[in-house]
C-alpha cells in the first residue's frame, strides 16, 4: 500500500482510499447528486436546476451528464445502491432522455425564488446525506471526501466546509426537510457542522 501511495505521488495523482462499499466515495456523491437533480425535474427545468447548482459547483449536473453521456451510469450505480434501500432508486426520467436542455455554465437563467430554495435545499440535502454516510460508515475519510469533491467533482467548497460555513442549525434544518421529502437517506450519526 505504501508503494502505491509513493507511485501515485510520483505520477501526480491523489489517491482516495475507500472501504469495500457499493460505489466508491466520490461516485456516491456525484451519482446521487445527479439522481436527485433528476427527481427535482418535477418542479424545475434542467437549466434552472443547473443554475442553482452553480452556487456550489462549476457546472450543473445536467450539463455534466450531457458531457459524459452519464444517464446510463447514474441508472447503473443507483440501481446497485438500491441494495442499501429503495430511496436510491434511479429517477425514471434518466432512461428516457438522451440530452438535457440546459445552458452553458455561467449563462444567465431566471430562477424564481421558490424554485431556487427548493432545489438548493434538496441538492444540499443529498450532498450532506451522502457525506454523513461516507464518514459515519468509514467508507472514506473527511479529508479525502472534502478534497475529492473539490478536485474531482468541481465543487467550489468541500461538503464539510459548506457545513461549517452554514452552521449546525442550518445544516439540520436542511437535513430535517430533506428527510421529510426523501425519507430513508442517511442522517448524521455525529455532529459535523
Model segments located where?
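N-terminal glycine-rich phosphate-binding loop for ADP-containing cofactors
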Residues: 1-193
